[in-house]
């Protein structure tokens, strides 16, 4: 029997506000344990939450970016559970009235086609703390993350393969990153993914029993975990077994999933309205204000790059991978840079330098103005493409004018025949044996002079002009 794969994803995105959702503590990542906490985070008796307006702003932006309807009257709920990293014994979340609902995004499949993936809801909530189990037999609780604002984005079960799930996550990450509400860095926990997967016989309308996957710390592991589950569940069903509703984690070392616990249902959390927070009204003016702050998104930019700038689909996709890179590219083109040349540099030398240095493009000294000027002096013959690589490294580290650096460092190409011809004559005088070989008709003897000339000019002779002049002067030797 063959089975159809059904996948839905729950994505937790940490919002990059300065303070937490209900307390004034810093929400910044990387501090010493429990440094970013106060009495609200520790849930001392009598403390009350105070809503961070910036979190609602971010929620509205996310809902708009994901083509969602927005609840004009929004409230919070208590999700009750006990765990050491949750000192209140409940989490403030949203249950029946999330900030956004009925959304969708389009994903691009491997065959080049597109597919719409529906998004059920996006709700705001507070993050929990973090437990660390030490080798000394003790467990430690760090509440720096407690109360950090999250938006949980829940897709419909519209994905039919691990590859579609991967494409959905890639598209979702791009969109959220463009809004500016999160840096979506999985390595820092600001984007976390839980996957729900089930199988059903082809032609059956009813979904099978789902399994939830956790510990998916990269998009690659999401795909690998789902691929493993497809095989595990299909094998179990074909042998007459029954799929239980359970939570499993992906074990990277063993390339498989491991049972964590039997899955709870929503009723186990005993949701009820949060009594310490009011109803929040979101009017059209607020929504319009947030909409005005949104940028043009990747899909629209890719279409523009292909249709207006003549770039390939691949180049357009690479240039829109992050908003910072796309903005950099657009600035360079607006300053007169040739779109294809700017694209080539950003995907070539610039990308290699960033990878080697472990930096992002906004962390280096090369500005779009610097890059455009450098491309221009390559085009006008001031420097060669080979010399440009040296110039680029200097500009990436130090910034400044490309032309000014080239002139100061003595890197300007020699293109003037009045300068090059005497140097060629000196090369002939200094290499009598090579001249004799050439005159005697020795095969490829003329090629040696190119190297001699480049050495004599310390690589600064314009290659095209040099070849032309060499050919003329060698012909005179032959005559």
Curated annotation (Swiss-Prot):
Record-stated family: Belongs to the GatB/GatE family. GatB subfamily.
Please verify whether the record's keywords include Hydrolase: no
So what EC number does this one have? 6.3.5.-
* Species assigned in the record: Streptococcus pyogenes serotype M12 (strain MGAS2096)
What is this protein for, i.e. what is its function? Allows the formation of correctly charged Asn-tRNA(Asn) or Gln-tRNA(Gln) through the transamidation of misacylated Asp-tRNA(Asn) or Glu-tRNA(Gln) in organisms which lack either or both of asparaginyl-tRNA or glutaminyl-tRNA synthetases. The reaction takes place in the presence of glutamine and ATP through an activated phospho-Asp-tRNA(Asn) or phospho-Glu-tRNA(Gln).
**How does this polypeptide assemble, per the annotation?**
Heterotrimer of A, B and C subunits.
Domain of life, per UniProt, equals: Bacteria
Which Pfam family, any one, appears in the UniProt record?
GatB_N
Into which EC class is this enzyme placed?
ligase
The molecular function GO annotations come to: asparaginyl-tRNA synthase (glutamine-hydrolyzing) activity; ATP binding; glutaminyl-tRNA synthase (glutamine-hydrolyzing) activity
Designated name of the protein: Aspartyl/glutamyl-tRNA(Asn/Gln) amidotransferase subunit B
Q: Which reaction does it catalyse?
A: L-glutamyl-tRNA(Gln) + L-glutamine + ATP + H2O = L-glutaminyl-tRNA(Gln) + L-glutamate + ADP + phosphate + H(+); L-aspartyl-tRNA(Asn) + L-glutamine + ATP + H2O = L-asparaginyl-tRNA(Asn) + L-glutamate + ADP + phosphate + 2 H(+)
For the keyword Membrane, the answer is: no
Keyword terms of this UniProt record? ATP-binding, Ligase, Nucleotide-binding, Protein biosynthesis
> What GO terms in the biological process aspect are recorded for it?
glutaminyl-tRNAGln biosynthesis via transamidation; translation
């Amino acid at each position: 029997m063959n089975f159809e794969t059904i996948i839905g994803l729950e994505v937790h995105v940490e919002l990059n506000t300065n303070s937490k959702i209900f307390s004034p503590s810093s929400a910044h990542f990387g501090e010493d344990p429990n440094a970013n906490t106060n009495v609200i985070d520790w849930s001392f008796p009598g403390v009350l939450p105070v809503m961070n307006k910036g979190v609602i702003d971010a929620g509205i932006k996310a809902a708009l970016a994901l083509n969602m309807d927005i609840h004009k009257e929004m409230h919070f709920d208590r999700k009750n559970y006990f765990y050491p990293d949750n000192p209140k014994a409940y989490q403030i979340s949203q249950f029946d009235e999330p900030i956004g609902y009925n959304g969708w995004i389009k994903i691009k499949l491997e065959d080049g086609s597109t597919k719409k993936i529906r998004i059920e809801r996006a709700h705001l909530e507070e993050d929990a703390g973090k437990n660390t189990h030490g080798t000394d037999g003790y467990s430690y609780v760090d509440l720096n993350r407690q109360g950090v604002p999250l938006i949980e984005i829940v897709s419909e079960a519209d994905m039919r393969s691990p590859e579609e799930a991967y494409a959905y996550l890639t598209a979702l990450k791009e969109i959220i990153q463009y809004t500016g509400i999160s840096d979506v860095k999985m390595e820092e926990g600001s984007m976390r993914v839980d996957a729900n997967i089930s199988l059903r016989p082809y032609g059956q309308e009813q979904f099978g029993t789902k399994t939830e996957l956790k510990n998916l710390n990269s998009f690659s592991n999401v795909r690998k975990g789902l691929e493993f589950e497809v095989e595990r569940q299909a094998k179990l069903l074909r042998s007459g077994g029954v799929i239980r509703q359970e939570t499993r984690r992906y074990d990277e070392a063993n390339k498989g999933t491991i049972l964590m616990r039997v899955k709870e249902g929503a009723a186990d959390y005993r949701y009820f309205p949060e009594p310490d927070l009011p109803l929040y009204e979101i009017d059209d003016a607020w929504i319009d204000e947030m909409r005005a702050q949104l940028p043009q998104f990747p899909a629209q930019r890719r279409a523009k790059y292909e249709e207006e700038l003549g770039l390939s689909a691949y180049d357009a996709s690479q240039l829109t991978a992050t908003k910072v890179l796309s903005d950099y590219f657009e600035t360079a083109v607006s300053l007169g840079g040739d779109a294809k040349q700017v694209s080539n540099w950003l995907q070539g030398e610039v990308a290699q330098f960033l990878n080697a240095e472990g930096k992002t493009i906004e962390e280096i000294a090369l500005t779009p103005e610097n890059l455009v000027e450098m491309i221009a002096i390559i085009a006008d013959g001031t420097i060669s493409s080979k010399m440009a690589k040296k110039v680029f490294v200097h500009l990436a580290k130090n910034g400044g004018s490309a032309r000014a650096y080239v002139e100061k460092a003595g890197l300007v190409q020699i293109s003037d025949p009045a300068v090059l011809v005497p140097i060629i004559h000196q090369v002939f005088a200094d290499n009598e044996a090579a001249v004799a070989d050439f005159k005697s008709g020795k095969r490829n003897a003329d090629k040696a002079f190119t190297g001699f000339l480049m050495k004599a000019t310390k690589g600064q002779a314009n290659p095209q002009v040099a070849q032309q002049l060499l050919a003329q002067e060698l012909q005179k030797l032959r005559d």
